[in-house]
Amino acid sequence: MINVIASIRVKGDKLSDFLEIFKSNLTSVREERGCIEYFPAVDIDADLPPQSLDENVVTIIEKWESLEDLSDHLNAPHMLAYKEKVKDIVEGVSIKVLQEA
């Protein structure tokens, strides 16, 4: 199983726009071969040091059956369309691809 944690920094006041676009793509992604889990998450204040909060970051939590499935996901037509739609409201992306130790 492959785990992905993607942190997406969204420009200033564009968080709701980003989430609307992202959520409109959820069904297509979740129907992909190998998708086990896929959802967006935002920071909440849990008052736990050394927690850092950032209201302009959306964290995407993903689980895939294999690296091949993840690769297919990244090249799927609906993902290419999604990337085009969000390109002007995203400032940066950081991705971690993990497997159980």
Where are these regions (language model features)?
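Short conserved AdoMet
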Residues: 30, 65, 91
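Residue-level marker of intrinsically disordered, low-complexity segments enriched
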Residues: 3, 8, 34, 59, ...
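Short amphipathic alpha-helical segments
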Residues: 14-40, 78-86
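Generic structural motif
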Residues: 11-13, 67, 100
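Glycine-rich beta-strand-turn "strand-cap" elements at beta-sheet edges
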Residues: 39-56, 81-101
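Short, well-ordered beta-strand segments in beta-rich or mixed alpha/beta enzyme
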Residues: 2-9, 41-74
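Absolute protein N-terminus
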Residues: 1-2, 101
